[in-house]
């Protein structure tokens, strides 16, 4: 017979293994990553966020290098989420509420290829959902939407001062309106 401590440890190990399998990830470029990160941090089921640079062609870029628009990178948020609480389809629909999908290389006052919008996936298993949401969004516009849909080629974490920027600097610059953060905080994936 096992002791209560061993049974509890066994339960916790099994529970943690199950929880790990429910953790999924997606990379979203929605203009300036400060606001995009803060927006997604408000959504129930988002476990963690990390800002950085995706799908460029240099190694270990700095913010100053990316800012030149000579590296091919997009400011991007790496999002880990609990699939039991929030699904990819919900997150993508929330993403489209926070961007102007018709704007090429610009969101708000921020302009340049680093501010382009994109969905960068880590598994082909994500494509059916991504394609569905893209088709629904495209149906709303007469011209093609300007949102990239590509596999993630690379991602480099941005410097520490960019991480959780709007938490550390509540009055800092953001291209997204405050009301959008309130909306995200109240939003819930009702399919879960």
Language model segments and positions:
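Flexible coil/turn and secondary-structure edge motifs
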Residues: 6-192
